[in-house]
């Protein structure tokens, strides 16, 4: 075995130890997080704004720091790397274990880069995480904001969208009046904080709606888009389905626009109080799809969190 092979094996072994530690909901040290994120940055920088993904793959929605429910998701859907996963953003904020959740997903990405795709959600941003919990959690668990800064710098590199077998377009939020084609998405520079407006913002913030055309979003960012918009986007880009997350749906998944758009939400009993089911979408070798719904994992003793995070649209 060459010296480079030995180094690679050592790094891999160390990663496996870190993943094992994280699976027990134990955070990594600050230096380990920094080294992990540097490696992840190299991998993610090579990925496209529209990252191609092969089937079979299991598509997942928001996790929001609900670590034990993520562990349940892996128990039901299969462990990585036995199952390929595509996560559509919002790993942090609201739940009590954002640090462990996002660190585990990034560690799995570094260990199995071809098996896991992690997209950016609207909560993978500096501004949002300072309000909805991740920043405060990092301060509480590490005593400073260094880990928060390390992760929010890494978030700039997360791909914005993915394309499964050239026919299922996956993203966190929704469509944009600034984007007609997937090539439009491929062409812009994503390595930045999520802007307040424009195409990149819309991809992470928009929602499907029953009304036709484009509408003002009640969220204050992105747009609402009607079935006519979805149909045109499907036709222009030869798509079969748009899969997205971003909205709480009580059954864990919800069809809209005559099954041209599906919302997938993977945080059961969201915020530990909403009473919803979660789901994941399995896309098989033949591109058939199956939804798997699941309930919350048993509650553990939750940490004392004195500061209540403000509500916004769920």
UniProtKB/Swiss-Prot annotation:
MF terms in GO: metal ion binding; protein serine/threonine phosphatase activity
UniProt KW Cytoplasm keyword: yes
Binding site for Mn(2+) 2: 90, 122, 172, 246
S-S bonds: none
Transmembrane segments: none
Residues given in the record as Mn(2+) 1 binding sites: 62, 64, 90
Cofactor note (record): Binds 2 manganese ions per subunit.
PROSITE patterns recorded: SER_THR_PHOSPHATASE (PS00125)
Record InterPro entries: Calcineurin-like_PHP_ApaH, Metallo-depent_PP-like, PPA2-like, Ser/Thr-sp_prot-phosphatase
Family, as annotated: Belongs to the PPP phosphatase family. PP-2A subfamily.
Protein name as it appears in the record: Serine/threonine-protein phosphatase PP2A-5 catalytic subunit
The organism of origin for this protein: Nicotiana tabacum
């Amino acid at each position: 075995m060459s010296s480079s092979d030995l180094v690679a094996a050592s790094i891999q072994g160390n990663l496996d130890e870190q993943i094992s530690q994280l699976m027990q909901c134990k955070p990594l040290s600050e230096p380990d997080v920094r080294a992990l994120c540097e490696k992840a940055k190299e991998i993610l920088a090579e990925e496209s704004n529209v990252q191609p993904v092969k089937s079979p793959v299991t598509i997942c929605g928001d996790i929001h720091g609900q670590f034990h429910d993520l562990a349940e998701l892996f128990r039901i859907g299969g462990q990585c790397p036995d199952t390929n996963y595509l996560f559509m953003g919002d790993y942090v904020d609201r739940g009590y274990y954002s640090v462990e959740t996002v660190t585990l997903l990034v560690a799995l990405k570094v260990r199995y880069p071809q098996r896991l795709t992690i997209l950016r959600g609207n909560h993978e941003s500096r501004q949002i995480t300072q309000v909805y919990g991740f920043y405060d959690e990092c301060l509480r668990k590490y005593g400073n904001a260094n880990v928060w800064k390390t992760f929010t710098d890494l978030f700039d590199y997360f791909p914005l969208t993915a394309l499964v077998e050239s026919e299922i377009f996956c993203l966190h939020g929704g469509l944009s009046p600034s984007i007609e084609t997937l090539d439009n998405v491929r062409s812009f520079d994503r390595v930045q904080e999520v802007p307040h407006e424009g195409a990149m913002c819309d991809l992470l913030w928009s929602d499907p709606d029953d009304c036709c055309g484009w509408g003002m979003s009640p969220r204050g960012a992105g747009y609402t888009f009607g079935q006519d918009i979805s149909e045109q986007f499907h036709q222009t880009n030869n798509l079969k389905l748009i899969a997205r997350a971003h909205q709480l749906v009580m059954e864990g998944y919800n069809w809209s626009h005559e099954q041209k758009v599906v919302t997938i939400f993977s945080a059961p009993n969201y915020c530990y109080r909403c009473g919803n089911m979660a789901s994941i979408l399995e896309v098989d070798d033949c591109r058939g799809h199956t939804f798997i719904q699941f309930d919350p994992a048993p509650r553990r003793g939750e940490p004392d969190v004195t500061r209540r995070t403000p509500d916004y649209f769920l």
